[in-house]
């Protein structure tokens, strides 16, 4: 008798994705982040669901409903902090996952890569709207500043912003719709992630060498299931350390003050995972230029496959490209730091330099480095 997992219509899908999936035998821990992102998403949906049971999406009661969750609901505090810090873990895994794709040339799987870029943008939108929901000072002013950027779009900008706000300022209508979108988007992300996986399984995984691994494949279970479980345990351990010891480490103290449209906080800044884009946005003196630069800072990922000039797929055997990659990482860390600093000398100049470097490395220096390596190898 043939095993039920290979014949049953539903079990067959699970089997082909997680059990009998032929996987390269040499993929490293950098390949763990895909499954970790899945775990993060499930965790966020579950904690978010329980938070939504007690949250009220109304300007008058939103802030106090979050306080009520933390003080009066059984284990509400841990659910709230797991959700808030879970978002940070989500983005750490996202950045690692994208970085892995850049380093090992996984972006040559075009459909999978473009689907991933869409997933990244959707997740960023979801996180932004979630940050607005507690209705603290930074929630309100963050929402005001970021939505206001759309007014830079010529001709339709002002109408577009007022349409998104549902009025002439960020108010009741804005909060209600942001809650609705924040609730629905994670389920859309889950569906998109399935499509992402579907595209990946059409080609099979890449591996650190970038060389086709058809000659040396092993079953996903038990080898990589056990490896994913180890990764998951490390993820949950680090999340719980954050939640139980320093839950407010990555948050903004201003968000413990209820939203007040009459009082602007001295430094308006988003959560840490948006700071690199925020720094790029601020580094251009022109409003529309800044908005375009910030959007392109993410959309530039779509161009990466077309800028691949190397004869090798992975950077594993390309030391010059490796240097470029790590300079890019350092540049992104610099941008993240600058995004959290006030707009004054010397931060302005550093931010502008780091922003120019970011685009220069991806658009010019990396393709040039690849061409140099090709010539050195006489390819």
UniProtKB/Swiss-Prot annotation:
It is found in: Mitochondrion inner membrane. The chain crosses the membrane at residues 33-53, 77-98, 113-133, 178-198, 226-246, 288-308, 320-340, 347-367. It is a multi-pass membrane protein. Disulfide bonds: none annotated. A ubiquinone binds at residue 201. Heme b b562 binds at residues 83, 182. Its cofactor is heme b. GO terms for biological process: mitochondrial electron transport, ubiquinol to cytochrome c. Heme b b566 binds at residues 97, 196. GO terms for molecular function: metal ion binding; ubiquinol-cytochrome-c reductase activity. The cytochrome bc1 complex contains 11 subunits: 3 respiratory subunits (MT-CYB, CYC1 and UQCRFS1), 2 core proteins (UQCRC1 and UQCRC2) and 6 low-molecular weight proteins (UQCRH/QCR6, UQCRB/QCR7, UQCRQ/QCR8, UQCR10/QCR9, UQCR11/QCR10 and a cleavage product of UQCRFS1). This cytochrome bc1 complex then forms a dimer. This is Cytochrome b. It comes from Arabitragus jayakari.
């Amino acid at each position: 008798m043939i095993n039920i997992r290979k014949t049953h219509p539903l079990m067959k899908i699970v089997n082909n994705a997680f059990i009998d999936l032929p996987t390269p035998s040499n993929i490293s821990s950098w390949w763990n982040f895909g499954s970790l992102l899945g775990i993060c998403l499930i965790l966020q949906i579950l904690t978010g669901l329980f938070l939504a049971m007690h949250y009220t999406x109304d300007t008058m009661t939103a802030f106090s409903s979050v306080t009520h969750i933390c003080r009066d609901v059984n284990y509400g505090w841990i659910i709230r902090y797991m959700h808030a810090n879970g978002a940070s873990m989500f983005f750490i895994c996202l950045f690692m996952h994208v970085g892995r794709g850049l380093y090992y040339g996984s972006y040559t799987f075009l459909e999978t890569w473009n689907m991933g870029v869409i997933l990244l943008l959707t997740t960023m939108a979801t996180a932004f709207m979630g940050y607005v929901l507690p209705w603290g000072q930074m929630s309100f002013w963050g929402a005001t500043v970021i939505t206001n950027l759309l007014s830079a779009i010529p001709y339709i900008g002002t109408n577009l912003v007022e349409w998104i706000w549902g009025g002439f300022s960020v108010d009741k209508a804005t909060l209600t719709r942001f809650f609705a979108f924040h609730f629905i988007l994670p389920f859309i992300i889950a569906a998109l992630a399935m499509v992402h996986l579907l595209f990946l399984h059409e080609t099979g995984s890449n591996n650190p060498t970038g060389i086709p691994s058809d000659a040396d494949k092993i079953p996903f279970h038990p080898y990589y299931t056990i490896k994913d479980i180890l990764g998951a345990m490390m993820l949950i351990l680090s999340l719980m350390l954050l939640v139980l010891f320093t839950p407010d480490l990555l948050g903004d103290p201003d968000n413990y003050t209820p939203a007040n449209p009459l009082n602007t906080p001295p430094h308006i800044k988003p959560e840490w995972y948006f700071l690199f884009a925020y720094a790029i946005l601020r580094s251009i003196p022109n409003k529309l230029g800044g908005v375009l630069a910030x959007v392109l800072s993410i959309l530039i990922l779509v161009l990466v496959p077309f800028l691949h000039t190397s004869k090798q797929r992975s950077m594993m055997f390309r030391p010059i490209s490796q240097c470029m990659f790590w300079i890019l990482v350092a540049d992104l860390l610099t941008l993240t730091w600058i995004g959290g600093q006030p707009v004054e000398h010397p931060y302005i100049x550093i931010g502008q330099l780091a922003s120019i470097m970011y685009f220069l490395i991806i658009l010019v220096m990396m393709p040039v480095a690849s061409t140099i390596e090709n010539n050195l190898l006489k390819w």
